[in-house]
Amino acid sequence: MLSFLPKTPSLMQEELKVKFRAKRKALKLTQEELSIKSGVSLGSLKRFESSGQISLESLLKVALVLECLGDFEGVCQQREEMPESIEDLI
């Protein structure tokens, strides 16, 4: 059965840490290299990849280096209203 409930913050945190680690590895960057390029401390990167904990500023700096900063542009954008019926589409 499909669930339309939003993900929990904990689940989102878990998914983000996994995706960011995978992206770092795909770009063949070590944690140390990412730390230097992003200006985020090595300790912060290690904590993020293990627990998902990171400041928003650091997350965005890492996203810039990992070429996914643009993915954050759609966050909290107002969505268009969905039609209530097929007649509303016509």
Question: For each predicted feature, which ranges?
Answer:
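Short alpha-helical DNA-recognition segment
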Residues: K28-K46
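A short, Lys/Arg-rich alpha-helix, primarily the initiator
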Residues: L2-A26
